[in-house]
Design a protein with these regions (language model features):
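Glycine-rich beta-strand-centered segment in the early N-terminal region that forms part
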Residues: 44-61, 74-133
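NAD(P)H dinucleotide-binding glycine-rich loop of Rossmann-like/cofactor-binding domains
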Residues: 83-86, 95, 123-210, 257-268
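Hydrophobic/small residue at the entry helix of a nucleotide-binding pocket
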Residues: 187, 214-215, 305-306
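Helix-to-beta-strand junctions that scaffold the AdoMet/dcAdoMet cofactor pocket
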Residues: 201, 314-315
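NAD(P)H cofactor-binding loop motif with strongest signal on the N-terminal glycine-rich segment
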Residues: 210-211, 302
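Adenosine-nucleotide cofactor-binding segment
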Residues: 225-305
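Glycine-centered, small-residue-biased loops immediately flanking beta-strands
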Residues: 318
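Rossmann-fold NAD(P)-binding glycine/threonine-rich loop
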Residues: 326-338
């Protein structure tokens, strides 16, 4: 018989569900920096609904949405949870996982208790007419990101997810390898391959912001696999060398530049200095490539500090594709460079 609570790193027999679990939890009363806001707590293990699965988490990834959740900005995650009928007094962080199925809802037929799975981060209502019509679930009105828009994230001993989120784990991968790319990897893939005709092609130059981070490191590898040429933007030579090991053809150390952020007014004396900085950054891309070719795709996620520069260096007919705003949400586009 399962114990009431297992120590972190200890697992009950397959199929035996304890009453309580350890979890990394955020509460509205302590929104702030992650080191203070995210704390280990003991909570009741959630019960799966008819279309759900309860998964013992073997490994979980880390994403910037953990930071956003901890701060309660730009979204108060506990308020968002109310929309889905979930608890509103706490939030468990985490949107990547690999693990073992421990319990199933009454309507689930394609999974088995004991099955090893990876968990993707997309959730939606099972009866959403948009999804049932075969359209992109990510654009459905009921779409939400598990572990950010929802309560029961992955940094816990157990998580409850919609059954369709569970995919078979490849046997040759470790738990950690299987868990790492389920949110960042799918996001990076969609950014690079999801917007035809603006998809990475052999020979394409792709500028990857934050090349050594979770999104960027996967983007660099996906560009390489597609035959493209990734130029990583990093904050140190060490990170640049790491990106080269992943398959980047070159890198640019952004700490060499100081023109970041929203540019001064176009007709102000300060704008000339900003433009000189952006031109120097573009020249650094050419130096990294060894040729005067601008990026056909700019892989963006910092947002406010970098979008103006991305717009400046992107090639004619190219694409800036963005999934976040880690440096801020307000930005500016100079239409002369569109």
């Amino acid at each position: 018989m399962a114990k009431d609570l297992y120590a972190i790193g200890e697992a009950p027999p397959v199929g035996e569900v304890p009453a309580r679990m350890h979890a990394q939890v955020v509460r509205p009363s302590r929104y702030g920096e992650p080191r203070d806001a995210i704390r280990d707590e003991v909570l009741d293990v959630p019960e799966p609904g008819p279309h759900d699965a309860l998964v013992l988490v073997m490994a979980s990834g880390v994403n910037f949405n953990n930071v956003w959740a901890a701060r309660g900005v730009p979204v108060d995650v506990t308020r968002t949870q109310a929309r889905w009928g979930e608890p509103t007094d706490f939030h468990i962080v985490g949107s990547d996982a690999s693990g073992v199925v421990y319990a199933l809802g009454s309507e689930v037929r394609h999974l088995e208790v004991g099955q090893h799975v990876v968990v993707h981060a997309g959730q939606w209502d099972h009866d959403d007419p948009w999804v049932l019509a075969g359209r992109d679930p990510g654009l459905a009105s009921s779409f939400r990101v598990w572990g950010y828009d929802t309560c029961w994230g992955s940094v816990a001993q157990f998580t409850v997810v919609q059954a369709h989120q569970c995919l078979p784990k490849a046997e040759h991968l470790t738990w950690e390898e299987a868990a790492a790319p389920t949110l960042t990897g799918s996001t990076a893939y969609r950014m690079l391959h999801g917007w035809p005709p603006n998809t990475v092609q052999p020979g394409d130059v792709v500028l990857v912001w934050g090349g050594a981070g979770g999104l960027g490191s996967l983007a660099v590898q996906l560009v390489r696999l597609a035959g493209g040429r990734a130029v990583a933007v990093v904050s140190s030579e060490q990170k640049g060398r790491y990106c080269m090991e992943l398959g980047a053809v070159g890198y640019v150390d952004r700490t060499r530049f100081d023109h970041w952020g929203v540019p001064p007014a176009w007709d102000s004396p300060e704008r000339e200095a900003w433009t000189a900085g952006a031109k120097a950054f573009g020249a650094a891309i050419w130096d990294a490539l060894g040729e005067r070719t601008n990026p056909r795709i700019v892989f963006e996620h910092p947002g406010q500090d970098t979008i103006p520069t991305s717009n400046f260096v992107c090639d004619r007919g190219g694409m800036i594709v963005i999934c976040a705003g880690t440096s801020g949400y307000d930005t500016m586009i100079d239409v002369r460079y569109l």
